[in-house]
Amino acid sequence: MGLEKKSALLEDLIEKCGGCAVVDGGFATQLEIHGAAINDPLWSAVSLIKDPELIKRVHMEYLEAGADVVVTSSYQATIPGFLSRGLSMEESESLLQKSVKLAVEARDRFWDKVSKTSGHSYNRALVAASIGSYGAYLADGSEYSGSYGEDVSLDKLKDFHRRRIQVLVEASPDLLAFETIPNKLEAQACVELLEEENVQIPAWICFTSVDGENAPSGESFQECLETLNKSNNICAVGINCAPPQFMDNLIRKFSKLTQKAIVVYPNSGEVWDGKAKKWLPSQCFGDAEFEMFATKWRDLGAKLIGGCCRTTPSTIKAISRDLKRR
């Protein structure tokens, strides 16, 4: 299936959902709720090694909550990260592919069950392969600063992402999801890689924001979106892992800057200290607030809405209930 037909899958899903589809929620934090120990440089990806069945269980929980798109557990799954744990190249690549296979297996099992039930309100979900930023691999909080240092060039970022993208594409997800991109340079690297590798799977690119106005690097989103807007490989652009209170302004901003579908999946409002590796006391929003937010974000122009860190299947159920209330 070529890029055009794959892109149509997302467009058709959004249409079936009444104009706005539901993305799943926080994955790593849901693993923690089930007792997984993920205080590790690999973060949620460590469960690909230790407990793949738990990963499938979390996917199922989000599907049952009403997610139309499930995102794989590969956000912090990188070949250099696996190699540093003593795994071979073959084992590292196999784990990356496993992240997609687990999500696909969960999606297919869930759909096989509910599609036989009359009157259900579910859609056959799409699987998006998560690709975390270079800063996520560094695990030093730089995905929230955009400061990679002068020695990190466009070519270095492409070299970092290339093999991971190749391996994930070989596993045949429906979408690629580049997440918490902090600067224009990495966004450009991702777009150029998709073209260089002739990737026939549509992708979204999500930035994050620490001020509600710009990318973490300080670059304007107008600058960041220039390359993305010209790419046929990019089906959607947006924001993830930023506070919910930033979304109204950012959706309005993106609506003026792009014709691409807009995707937003904020965190719960809590703030992660990437250096101290802990959540800081801050305003936290619950399911009732997210239910209200979802209506507003849809009305402002978002086409895909979900949750990131510290959101749960309960959050996604509230969002789904609201958006699918015709």
Swiss-Prot record:
Cystine crosslinks: none
Q: Which InterPro entries match?
A: Betaine-hCys_S-MeTrfase_BHMT (IPR017226), HCY_dom (IPR003726), HCY_dom_sf (IPR036589), Hcy_S-methyltransferase (IPR051486)
Q: Which Pfam families match?
A: S-methyl_trans (PF02574)
Induction entry? Not induced by selenate or selenite. Up-regulated by sulfate. Not affected by the status of methionine, s-methylmethionine or homocysteine, or by cadmium.
Q: Which domain of life is it from?
A: Eukaryota
Identify the cofactor(s).
Answer: Zn(2+)
Q: Which PANTHER family match?
A: HOMOCYSTEINE S-METHYLTRANSFERASE 1 (PTHR46015:SF7), ZGC:172121 (PTHR46015)
According to UniProt, the name of this protein is Homocysteine S-methyltransferase 1
> Which classification does the entry list for the species?
Eukaryota, Viridiplantae, Streptophyta, Embryophyta, Tracheophyta
